[in-house]
Amino acid sequence: MGNCCPGSGDAEPASSDASTGNGSSSFKAGASPSSAPAQNKPPAPIGPVLGRPMEDVRSIYTIGKELGRGQFGVTSLCTHKATGQKFACKTIAKRKLSTKEDVEDVRREVQIMYHLAGQPNVVELKGAYEDKQSVHLVMELCAGGELFDRIIAKGHYTERAAASLLRTIVEIIHTCHSLGVIHRDLKPENFLLLSKDEDAPLKATDFGLSVFFKQGEVFKDIVGSAYYIAPEVLKRSYGPEADIWSVGVILYILLCGVPPFWAESEHGIFNSILRGQVDFTSDPWPRISASAKDLVRKMLNSDPKKRISAYEVLNHPWIKEDGEAPDTPLDNAVMNRLKQFRAMNQFKKAALRVIAGCLSEEEIRGLKEMFKSMDSDNSGTITVDELRKGLSKQGTKLTEAEVQQLMEAADADGNGTIDYDEFITATMHMNRMDREEHLYTAFQYFDKDNSGCISKEELEQALREKGLLDGRDIKDIISEVDADNDGRIDYSEFAAMMRKGNPEANPKKRRDVVI
């Protein structure tokens, strides 16, 4: 992976500051400096994931309420026992780390976060701990909400405000690239506000898919979130330029309220990205400045070699402080679309949390065995005929159309066969999103009175329980999902919403916990 950091056991910087909780087994919060060391205490065993002595995070922090939950773990509020300072603790269950690649991914996430330590707009990793059951990452707590929250809270919006936000984002990416790191999952949800103060800094978070890179190194695995994935990622040949594309998509959304590449399915979104046709004719684009459109075009150039760099973005006249970005308010429709786009993402997040709990560890393991049994000629790839026969033998009830859909979605390189990674990615995606029982389980979570419909009150109650929405967003969701305009969401409307442009492109690789 071109790592430019030391091994995971050496990644953590030394510190004697108790408030950092730096995971060093030589210091316990609250211990007296004059305390005599324990006699004949056996050394702690070395953890297989982090490669250093295991330590109980609860000896330093009090773990509090759950903040978020994902397929691979839970994020909780935690409090440092000695100082009372609050942090976020991301806990990854070791039983979920079933492959060597999984373990390496966690190690790399820790290495990268320590490598970026001290950068003012990157969430700081305070400590990494490992016990017998889990790995715990204690991080700076960002309590101010997501990127769009600041825009929506102000109630008015200008190109100059968008330029200011984008400048911070690109400065973060420029720093990452200068330090040899590609983020690979840039999206509005991964930029959080440190607090609810108006001048609170914006922080980049979620480095679970990030990698170290060397100049000229080429990556091939498809990772990220569908709307924001660069075309060269889908072609399995990319470098740091892919981050610029993702930020270009964010800029497009900031200016008009919707993504530039849209379709009814993830596969359709990918096709739209590969076509690369960006709409600058629909409202509000005729009223957006020429300078803003010029920057978007340069960031969304389908050829990564011709795409503008982070340094060049920062020197573009539109993004510069007191530059060309006009200070006149953007169309109210842009604000409404932003609210709706954010609200829909939040609704899906809540539903995905329910669905994530439906896919068992046994199902994941079973998918690996399924691939082996389908690959009848042991070629390492399977054809559509092998897929059809294999699914039938497994007793999986899929229609011919669903088999074809699976094949098309999985065959990322378009060569007519799917390899192991493509198969696991696509089948896990189907298990999480398209299986009827999983969707229905999620629907029932919202349908509190079992009436067969989700009312405004039920939706508000469920999302408030998850801490995801305030009341202003409920109307936006209802109006978007409620196809028959009866003021409620029935199962067919819910299922259509869940299947529309699912944002997760590679669930197999993901270890992030959605907050």
From Swiss-Prot:
SMART domains: EFh (SM00054), S_TKc (SM00220). It holds the Pfam family EF-hand_7. It catalyses: L-seryl-[protein] + ATP = O-phospho-L-seryl-[protein] + ADP + H(+); L-threonyl-[protein] + ATP = O-phospho-L-threonyl-[protein] + ADP + H(+). Ca(2+) 3 binds at D447, D449, S451, C453, E458. Ca(2+) 4 binds at D482, D484, D486, R488, E493. Expressed in heading panicles, spikelets and mature pollen grains. The active site is at D185. It is a lipid-anchor. Transmembrane segments: none annotated. Activated by calcium. Autophosphorylation may play an important role in the regulation of the kinase activity. One of its GO terms (molecular function) is calmodulin binding. A lipid is attached at G2 (N-myristoyl glycine). Disulfide bonds: none annotated. InterPro entries: CDPK_Ser/Thr_kinases (IPR050205), EF-hand-dom_pair (IPR011992), EF_Hand_1_Ca_BS (IPR018247), EF_hand_dom (IPR002048), Kinase-like_dom_sf (IPR011009), Prot_kinase_dom (IPR000719), Protein_kinase_ATP_BS (IPR017441), Ser/Thr_kinase_AS (IPR008271). Ca(2+) 2 binds at D411, D413, N415, T417, E422. Residues 325-355 are annotated as: Autoinhibitory domain. ATP binds at L67, G68, R69, G70, Q71, F72, G73, V74, T75, K90. SUPFAM superfamilies: EF-hand (SSF47473), Protein kinase-like (PK-like) (SSF56112). Its main location: membrane. Keywords: ATP-binding, Calcium, Kinase, Lipoprotein, Membrane, Metal-binding, Myristate, Nucleotide-binding, Repeat, Serine/threonine-protein kinase, Transferase. GO terms for biological process: intracellular signal transduction. This is Calcium-dependent protein kinase 2.
